[in-house]
Amino acid sequence: MERNLRKKRLGRVVSDKMDKTIVVAVETKVRHPLYGKTVNRTTKFKAHDENNEARFGDRVLIMETRPLSKDKRWRLVEIVEKAK
């Protein structure tokens, strides 16, 4: 698979308690099929953070990668914005 064809997601770190792993919550807006209201959907991804640099509340960019563990298939690309 080409490196630039891999999916990328922008989200917020909701947990950094594991070693070399962060949990990133990604929000997407979806229109309800019947009522048409825009609804926020949240999906959590476990991502590999090699240097343990991301902290709780940071906005991060993650990229799809090969399976690294049972449920880790993403890795940290960059920290877009540090938490205050």
Curated annotation (Swiss-Prot):
One of its GO terms (molecular function) is structural constituent of ribosome. Pfam families: Ribosomal_S17. Keywords: Ribonucleoprotein, Ribosomal protein, RNA-binding, rRNA-binding. The keyword Ribosomal protein applies. Coiled coil: none annotated. One of its GO terms (cellular component) is cytosolic small ribosomal subunit. One of its GO terms (biological process) is translation. One of the primary rRNA binding proteins, it binds specifically to the 5'-end of 16S ribosomal RNA. NCBIfam families: PRK05610.1 (NF004123), uS17_bact (TIGR03635). Belongs to the universal ribosomal protein uS17 family. Part of the 30S ribosomal subunit. This is Small ribosomal subunit protein uS17. It comes from Clostridium perfringens (strain 13 / Type A). The lineage of its organism: Bacteria, Bacillati, Bacillota, Clostridia, Eubacteriales. The gene is rpsQ.
